Amino acid sequence: MPAPSAADFARLRSLVAIEDLDARQSRPIEEVFTGRELTTIPVGTAEDVAAAFAKARAAQRGWAHRPVAERAAIMERFRDLVAKNRDFLMDVAQAETGKARSAAQEEIVDMMLNARYYARQAVKLLAPKRVQGLLPGVVKTVVNHHPKGVVGVISPWNYPMALSISDSIPALLAGNAVVVKPDSQTPYCTLANAELLYEAGLPRDLFAVVPGPGSVVGTAIVENCDYLMFTGSTATGRTLAEQCGRRLIGFSAELGGKNPMIVTRGAKLDVAAKAATRACFSNAGQLCISIERIYVERAVADEFTAKFGEQVRSMRLAATYDFTADMGSLISEDQIKTVSGHVDDAKAKGATVIAGGNIRPDIGPRFYEPTVLTGVTDEMECARNETFGPVVSIYPVESVAEAIEKANDTEYGLNASVWAGSKTEGEAIAAQLQAGTVNVDEGYALAFGSTAAPMGGMKASGVGRRHGADGILKYTESQTVATSRVLNLDPPLGISGTLWQKAMTPMIRAVQKLPGR
């Protein structure tokens, strides 16, 4: 199966929210597997962003008044179209990112899961909710959820479909419009799904895709949006949070991680070693929730390391548009430099390479072997810094308590994995880890795929949550409407303020004793 055709890219290019496309400056888009130019993409400006927001605001007013069930029906149709066009979508994802097809399929599944969950739950989650009022029977209190307006989404290159589309689905269902800035390396991943959203019945102005540099297009989105969703580095997240703070708008972000795995002496080592290959090396480790640190009880550390090393050395690297490759390419020369820099630094300072450790230009220009290190110490760059590539370090520990302490000894707190002798032990360990998601007997997919549950980071790994009720309600403004059924709190005619306050005191005491107070 080859990369998508020139005709495919030309069709998708026409969906960019930029006027006079052919007159604009453009940048090349490369096939990561080979480094050859596939097509080009127009480069947006701040004026393009402003124009997209103007159209989005006009369209959003009518969209917000449409019944939630009508919006949900569009997302159900979108889900069906994603399933129908999944092979083409995976081709686009592989061409722009260089990931293995199994990692591309994860993006398809994620979009389908989110579209189905929110389409089925939005009516319930967004419905006015009756809550207990000040005086039962006297005061009726209802909470409404109004859309923010126009949401800005700034998405990354590593999972460019899941992290642009899946984050936009609940925003749209909540009654907002969305303006997306895809990463400059992967704009067609977003455009390919925009095409399906429009085909499903979403008005085009409600979902605008404006490609361009973050310093220009990203800044303009922050200056125009009513809420910002960002996925990317912690450093950039801090900058965007400051910009949102100055405008007093809401902000949600999934940021960096240095995710730990704990393997206890009672774990099934064969199963854990095999699962760790996917947990560490899915999308060549370019996954925010992938594992970069493994803490193993010393009694089984040598055995686990041997089994894991054998699994990793047997992985197949290939530049192929089918499911025969276990791992694909890194996306860019910058990624190659970071990964090789971390590994070379570790080797120079005494770390041992158990598997991998080499660039593989014989396969493609940006391939790097899945790499396992031991003997990593704190002065090595890979010890505490996020590599965001196919590199993991194994650390023997004396006890589970030490493993938990070391797992938590990081500025990050995005994801963690636990392999123990029983589910009960695994869950007990999980509850002590400072991570937004923890998987027991799995690396990352169980928590990430549980779309009814919130997903996000603690500490420097993020703000806010995607998925679950949190993932849609964050795109709304809560409004409390309290209605007096009988009287207000002013003294009735003919009753003095002093007498009224004396009468109110026992009433307030009685209310405080009611259930739920």
Curated annotation (Swiss-Prot):
Binding site for NADP(+): W157, N158, K181, P182, D183, S184, G232, S233, L255, E386
Catalytic site positions: E254, C288
EC number: 1.2.1.79
Domain of life: Bacteria
Keyword Iron-sulfur assigned: no
Enzyme class label: oxidoreductase
Protein name as annotated: Putative succinate-semialdehyde dehydrogenase [NADP(+)]
